[in-house]
């Protein structure tokens, strides 16, 4: 990989990370220190849910520009599709690693927190909505300014109407399957918003929520929720969207699900 990117990319390392980038020594050290600091915090937050896999250190790739970044991540999407833009991605294929395009450190920090959360949850077969909900809420816990109304894509008064216009009995199935997180329309942002909200609601009873996360599966259609949370998944969506046919129907998408980790 280093050879393919060219001589201006180099590997630097810390106690728990290997970083491939074109950064000078000092900026590379700052990135690694940031990764180490966030790893400690996220481990504390996730507790026993965070199980680290692999034969060694976490691998982080910081690409010099967006072109290099998208050229790389395109290898992990099906050919011929159109997908939402992204600022980082955890890639589970092969030796799990996460990738980000180079930006100012203030912009990279929350992306690193988000993708590192995915990294620490990679052993769990959880659905995309839960994977992303946990990652976004972890990111917002560490960087609360990102949860402020001024940092959102839409004005607060617009969000309920946009949800109401987008979600119905059919489109909600793309949320449960994870496909809506890859949408190039409003479905992308609305999926993340819905995921973070219903994940936060489910986490209200922390012991029950942790048991749910440990047992949830991409295609169980809410079995783990009924068992550990004590209510069906659609009740969480109902609390955000109001009345509707929100129940997951895994028979419609069980063979075509996304893990999250976007």
Regions inferred by a protein language model and the residue ranges of each:
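N-terminal low-complexity, Pro/Thr/Ser-rich intrinsically disordered segments
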Residues: 1-4
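Juxtacatalytic substrate-recognition/specificity segment
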Residues: 6-127, 144, 221-228
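Acidic/His/Gly-enriched intrinsically disordered linker/tail segments
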Residues: 79-96, 107, 125-262
């Amino acid at each position: 990989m280093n050879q393919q990117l060219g001589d201006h990319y180099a590997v630097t390392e810390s106690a728990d990370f290997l970083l491939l980038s074109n950064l000078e020594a000092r900026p590379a050290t700052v990135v690694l220190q940031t990764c180490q600091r966030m790893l400690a915090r996220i481990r504390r937050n996730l507790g026993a849910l965070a199980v680290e896999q692999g034969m060694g250190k976490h691998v982080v790739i910081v690409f010099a520009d967006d072109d290099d970044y998208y050229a790389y991540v395109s290898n992990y999407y099906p050919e011929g599709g159109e997908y939402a833009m992204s600022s980082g991605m955890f890639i589970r294929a092969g030796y799990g690693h996460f990738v980000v395009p180079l930006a100012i450190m203030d912009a990279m920090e929350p992306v690193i927190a988000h993708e590192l959360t995915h990294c620490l949850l990679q052993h769990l077969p959880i659905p995309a909505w839960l994977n992303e909900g946990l990652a976004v809420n972890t990111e917002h816990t560490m960087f609360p300014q990102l949860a402020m109304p001024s940092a959102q894509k839409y004005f607060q008064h617009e969000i309920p109407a946009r949800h109401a216009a987008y979600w119905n009995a059919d489109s909600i199935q793309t949320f449960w399957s994870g496909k809506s997180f890859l949408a190039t329309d409003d479905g992308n942002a609305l999926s993340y918003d819905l995921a973070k909200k219903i994940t936060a609601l489910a986490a209200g009873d922390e012991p029950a929520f942790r048991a749910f996360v440990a047992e949830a599966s991409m295609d169980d259609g809410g079995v783990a929720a009924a068992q550990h949370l004590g209510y069906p998944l659609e009740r969480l969506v109902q609390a955000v969207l109001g009345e509707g046919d929100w129940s997951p129907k895994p028979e419609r998408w069980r063979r075509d699900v996304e893990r999250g980790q976007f």
